[in-house]
Amino acid sequence: MNARIPPSVLNAAHTLSQVSTLWDDQIVPQLQDYIRIPAKSPMFDADWAANGYLDTVVRNTAAWIEAQKVSGLVLEIVRLPGRTPVLFFEVPATKVGSTQTVLMYGHLDKQPEFTGWRNDLGPWTPKIDDGKLYGRGGADDGYAAYAAIAAIQTLKTQNVPHPRIVGLIESCEESGSYDLLPYIDVLKTRLGEVALVVCLDSGAGNYDQLWLTNSLRGMASGVLKVEILTEGVHSGDASGLVPSSFRIMRQVLDRLEDSATGRLLPASFHCEVPADRLSQAKATAAILGDEIYKRFPWAHYDCGGATAFALPTTTDPLQALLNRTWLPTLSVTGADGFPEMKNAGNVLRPYTAFKLSLRLPPLVEAAAAVQELKALLEDNAPYQARVTFEGLSSATGWNAPDTASWFEDALNAASQAHFGAPCGYVGQGGTIPLMNMLSKGFPAAQMMVCGVLGPKSNAHGPNEFLHIPYAKKLTAAVAHVIAQFP
């Protein structure tokens, strides 16, 4: 005879079954509709308010949540003048004597289309293939609000007592969350005493276990422009006398980066890796091994009958993890001042402009780094060229607080229950601006930063996908952790 499960304990099999049914019947169709809407973040759609796409996805998500009729749930779309909307919901506690709050976070704005999608795929054309839902924003991070409600629903249907739960779903995250702080100020009293944050905007080392993000890099982006002429001139007439704006750009960037290694030169852009993070990185490197770098779509070509692949900066698994999570890195993500190849005549161009994306270690303050970066790039320009750096957005990274024993136990139990493996810990190279804000505002809170962005899911790039089976198990695991909240 099977032992009776106490009513306060979540039944793992029942939870996964219920969550899976909701995903199949409702959440996946909702996400397909969401993918069809080009709800690009304000940085990538200056006319976002007039276009109305962000408002549409927020309204659609709110309508679905209200249709679920979760007991006690109250929802509001909060709007501040000139700012992107925020979806906020509250579910009162059913646990006797509970005074603390669980905050669930996600976002609905998207990165732009980018190029290189498979012929049968597109950013705004949802397609399910081999258990994966392809399309822009499904995994980053449109699913979050739906998964949060699904997790709450399974607590309700199994009559498992839970703390007060609030949801904060923004629509400016991909632009650096510059609209979020004013909303947090407005909602601060309604947030309550936050003791657990569930952020569903992160990644996974594989699809075989629950992964907790233990750090996030910060970021700073901006446009670096080098001007040497007021208009283009004949390259045969001017080259050799008029310096190339591209060559000046290279000289200026050499102040920031060692181009031979990719190492950033300013010491203030680096920080020491804490001992606990180093220990966790070693454990994760042992789990993931070569897949840490093999998962990327490396260029390849025929070399004497064998296939040669482009190489990463390192093939050591531990160093690979640290390079992408604790080292600062420069990426050039866009360029201006260049004609299309088919229209590129023999002209010495008047200017070169690059959009720079700087990833910063978790413990480096982004605002200070931006000021230092601006001075480093602009001062004493070669040939007295006009060199300007215009910052676009920045956000400080995040290092997770010490893990409480109940939280660690709950994470491992949830991972074992739904994946049959212990919880893994991994740093992420991306940025979630809210996490630093919340850690400062609620320093005692535990942070369940997790997500569906596992190998090859390719958020921000072509062929982004949401791994549906993993998303189902992650949703169930979130419910399990909330059920264990003391």
Description of each model-found segment:
Residues N2-G116, Y351, K355:
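N-terminal helical capping/dimerization or prosegment-like subdomains
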Residues H162-S244:
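Histidine/acidic-residue-rich, glycine-tolerant segments that coordinate divalent metal ions
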Residues S239-A260:
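A short core secondary-structure module
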Residues A150-T157, Q251-R255, H480-A483:
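Short glycine/serine- and small hydrophobic-enriched flexible loop segments
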Residues L108-D109, L256-T261, A375-Q384:
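A common structural junction motif
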Residues G97-I169, K473:
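Active-site metal-coordination/substrate-binding segment of hydrolases
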Residues G97, N206, L264-Y351, R359-E372, ...:
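An extended, acidic, His-containing surface patch that forms the Zn2+-binding/catalytic region
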